[in-house]
Structure formats: C-alpha cells, structure tokens
Amino acid sequence: MQAKAVARTVRIAPRKVRLVVDLIRGKQVGEAIAILNHTPKTASPVVEKVLKSAIANAEHNYEMDVNNLVVEKVFVDEGPTLKRFRPRAMGRASQINKRTSHITVVVSEKKEG
C-alpha cells in the first residue's frame, strides 16, 4: 500500500528542490527527516512538511506502521511560471521567470525479507 502527499505551486525553482529530494529517495522516513533537518537549503523545510504529510496520510488513512515506512518515490515537477520584467538600459526590459514547483512524496511499507 502507498500513501502520497503533494505540495503544489511552491515558490522555489524545481532545479533547486531536486537537489534536496535526491537526498531522501529510498530512505526510511526517520532517516529522511533527520537528513532534511540538517540540510541547509531553502527547499528542505518544504520537502520535510510534504514528507510529514505523507507519513500522516499513511498512518491515518491506511493504518500503516510508521516505523516500517520508506520513501518509495519522491519527484518534483515544474509548476506555472510567474513572468516579471526588469528595466534595462536604453528603455529596454528583460523578462525574469519566477519558477514554481509541484513536490510529490510517496511512502510505502518496507517489504519483509
């Protein structure tokens, strides 16, 4: 059985969030939370919140044992981009893309054996 949590339209670029989610893929949930607590990246608290939500979903909705949970899948998709403009020389303007992310965490019970 799998439990999932999704955070949509998080105002951090997907490229930066992927650096953090790569650290926890395949780990036990306790170890993953410890890694996120000690990772000095802006995306770490957001990913930790989504992971804790997935754990709570597993415990409440599917009655899984929290001690046996592992991070089965974790991935980041690109959300909608906010387009802004920055004034430049000689009356021109440059486009600034403020990127957003959709973060998905899937946890499941560790297989015996």
UniProtKB/Swiss-Prot annotation:
<dbReference type="InterPro" id="IPR001063">
    <property type="entry name" value="Ribosomal_uL22"/>
</dbReference>
<comment type="function">
    <text>This protein binds specifically to 23S rRNA; its binding is stimulated by other ribosomal proteins, e.g. L4, L17, and L20. It is important during the early stages of 50S assembly. It makes multiple contacts with different domains of the 23S rRNA in the assembled 50S subunit and ribosome.</text>
</comment>
<keyword id="KW-0689">Ribosomal protein</keyword>
<protein>
    <recommendedName>
        <fullName>Large ribosomal subunit protein uL22</fullName>
    </recommendedName>
</protein>
<comment type="function">
    <text>The globular domain of the protein is located near the polypeptide exit tunnel on the outside of the subunit, while an extended beta-hairpin is found that lines the wall of the exit tunnel in the center of the 70S ribosome.</text>
</comment>
<keyword id="KW-0694">RNA-binding</keyword>
<dbReference type="InterPro" id="IPR005727">
    <property type="entry name" value="Ribosomal_uL22_bac/chlpt-type"/>
</dbReference>
<dbReference type="Pfam" id="PF00237">
    <property type="entry name" value="Ribosomal_L22"/>
</dbReference>
<keyword id="KW-0687">Ribonucleoprotein</keyword>
<dbReference type="GO" id="GO:0019843">
    <property type="term" value="F:rRNA binding"/>
</dbReference>
<dbReference type="InterPro" id="IPR018260">
    <property type="entry name" value="Ribosomal_uL22_CS"/>
</dbReference>
<comment type="subunit">
    <text>Part of the 50S ribosomal subunit.</text>
</comment>
<dbReference type="GO" id="GO:0022625">
    <property type="term" value="C:cytosolic large ribosomal subunit"/>
</dbReference>
<dbReference type="GO" id="GO:0006412">
    <property type="term" value="P:translation"/>
</dbReference>
<comment type="similarity">
    <text>Belongs to the universal ribosomal protein uL22 family.</text>
</comment>
<dbReference type="InterPro" id="IPR036394">
    <property type="entry name" value="Ribosomal_uL22_sf"/>
</dbReference>
<dbReference type="InterPro" id="IPR047867">
    <property type="entry name" value="Ribosomal_uL22_bac/org-type"/>
</dbReference>
<keyword id="KW-0699">rRNA-binding</keyword>
<dbReference type="GO" id="GO:0003735">
    <property type="term" value="F:structural constituent of ribosome"/>
</dbReference>
